UniProtKB/Swiss-Prot annotation:
Group of enzyme by EC: ligase
Originating gene: RTCB
Residues forming coiled coils: none
Name this polypeptide is given: RNA-splicing ligase RtcB homolog
Glycyl lysine isopeptide (Lys-Gly) (interchain with G-Cter in SUMO2) crosslink location in chain: 496
Origin species: Papio anubis (Olive baboon)
GO cellular component: cytoplasm; cytosol; nucleoplasm; nucleus; tRNA-splicing ligase complex
Listed cofactors: Mn(2+)
Stored InterPro entries: RtcB, RtcB-like_sf, RtcB_euk
GO biological process: tRNA splicing, via endonucleolytic cleavage and ligation
Domain of life, per lineage: Eukaryota
Length: 505
């Protein structure tokens, strides 16, 4: 017997200006409560989605995000609560922007590939330069073209960095250390990556031959979809101290943002794991509310195989972003006829938006070892956390939030409050408001390109037909998302960036 919209509302309670609680009973078998963070505009979108679902209008075959947050709260071994961040929108199994942590010492606790996503370690890297907007404007088109020429982009794009099967095995195991050894990265790049750009539990043997075959030609490529490289300028500085630590000292300073993941390799790792886990669930009698939430006990062979394969795909994504950093440095050096070093093209930080990691957190006054699933959400550790780079010990971890094409992006910093409320996690971007198919129906790609040109943004796109899917209209407002996190105290704004050129798959 399905409930109507008003019945559903009985289970939802506003607990603060920016936070709602999802009470047990909203979906069956909830082990813990759910919460989601919103402001007024985002709240309206969340409730509209629920209302439509009650009328029988599903979201492209996915449950509404609120229901998905509830279903995650019903997974075995979950602790504290299932958390939806302001950019949450429905996805495969877990909503994108839903994070959850599972107790490693609970033998029932599970790992779920749907809680990481298909694009494993999809993430963002930000580079700074010592250039000013006035240096770049006259050569903006040239620079966009140079980046487009250097970085292979698009759906089936192939890498320019030479790589054979043995190289791939090593890259899967070593992450950024491989890039460093091969001369595609600077030593200090590594310091400024989450996990130092290498997940140690990676095992290339847990990545199938099919996944490797998909991954081999794609290294150092941008891919299509919401992946992009953007030349940006600093538009606003909210926290001068944090900005200085990141090497940002004035408005108009030029940066480059690279947004990419593990391409076909990560997708295949996830697909392979879901197949293996369906069988494991039958064997271990694991019941879930939604079959997209296929999972396995963390300690089971399937659970361990997935975590080792996921870590390898994560390393692949870090190598991928390192390769694109190398190509970006070359493109800039060529246009400005100098060296990347002289342009001060340093990595500010590199974060992952889709990953599961073992971390220590205090829950109900006790330190516990948890497997933290972050899907469409970003680690945001506070000042003095042992896992963040020395340079950022006093500011908290930099958190990179990519806006959508042609809108602004942000750099935030992690907070102590986020550590207690959300396991040191905050939003990751704008979050879709329209499905990809709807975006294609409602928007014309030429309009989208014209609009960017009107805003003075140089654009290079490999597949123009895919542009509508990524048009700003398809997304929630990134400023709403970032401000909600800021007001809720789970991360703080440091820098706002606006694009002047965008390169896209």
């Amino acid at each position: 017997m399905s409930r109507n919209y008003n019945d559903e509302l009985q289970f939802l309670e506003k607990i603060s200006k920016n936070c709602w609680r999802i009470k047990k009973g909203f979906v069956p078998n909830m082990q813990v409560e759910g919460v989601f963070y919103v402001n007024d505009a985002l709240e309206k979108l969340m409730f509209e989605e629920l209302r439509n679902a009650c009328r029988g209008g599903g979201v492209g075959g996915f449950l509404p995000a609120m229901k998905q947050i509830g279903n995650v709260a019903a997974l075995p071994g979950i602790v504290h609560r299932s958390i939806g961040l302001p950019d949450v929108h429905s996805g495969y199994g877990f909503a994108i922007g839903n994070m959850a942590a599972f107790d490693m010492n609970d033998s029932e606790a599970v790992v779920s590939p749907g809680g990481v996503g298909f694009d494993i370690n999809c993430g963002v890297r930000l580079l700074r330069t010592n250039l000013d907007e006035s240096d770049v404007q006259p050569v903006k088109e040239q620079l966009a073209q140079a980046m487009f020429d250097h970085i292979p982009v698009g759906v089936g794009s192939k890498g320019v960095i030479p790589m054979n099967a043995k190289d791939l095995e090593e890259a899967l195991e070593m992450g950024v250390d491989w890039s460093l050894r091969e001369g595609y990265a600077w030593a200090e790049d590594k310091e400024h990556c989450e996990e130092y750009g290498r997940m140690l539990q990676a095992d290339p043997n847990k990545v199938s031959a099919r996944a490797k075959k998909r991954g081999l030609p794609q290294l150092g490529t941008l891919g299509a979809g919401n992946h992009y490289a953007e030349i940006q300028v600093v538009d606003e500085i909210f926290n001068e101290y944090a900005a200085k630590k990141m090497g940002i000292d004035h408005k108009g300073q030029v940066c480059v943002m690279i947004h990419s993941g593990s391409r076909g390799l990560g997708h295949q790792v996830a697909t392979d794991a879901l197949v293996a886990m369906e069988k494991a669930m039958k064997r271990d009698k694991i019941i879930v509310n939604d079959r997209q939430l296929a999972c396995a006990r963390i300690a089971s062979p399937e659970g361990q195989d997935y975590l080792k394969g996921m870590a390898a795909a994560g390393n692949y994504a870090w190598v991928n972003r390192s390769s694109m950093t190398f190509l970006t440095r070359q493109a800039f050096a060529k246009v400005f006829n100098t060296t990347p070093d002289d342009l001060d093209l340093h990595v500010i930080y590199d974060v992952s938006h889709n990953i599961a990691k073992v971390e220590q957190h205090v829950v109900d006054g006790k330190e516990r070892t948890l497997l933290v699933h972050r899907k469409g959400s970003t680690r945001a550790f506070p000042p003095h956390h042992p896992l963040i780079a020395v340079d950022y010990q006093l500011t908290g971890q930099p958190v990179l939030i990519g806006g959508t094409m042609g809108t602004c992006s942000y750099v935030l910093t992690g907070t102590e409050q986020g550590m207690t409320e959300t396991f040191g996690t905050t939003c990751h971007g704008a979050g879709r408001a329209l499905s990809r198919a709807k975006s294609r129906r409602n928007l014309d790609f030429q309009d989208v390109l014209d609009k960017l040109a009107d805003m003075g943004i140089a654009i290079r796109v490999a597949s123009p037909k895919l542009v509508m899917e990524e048009a700003p209209e398809s997304y929630k407002n990134v400023t709403d998302v970032v401000n909600t996190c800021h007001d809720a105290g789970i991360s703080k704004k440091a820098i706002k960036l606006r694009p002047i050129a965008v390169i896209k798959g």
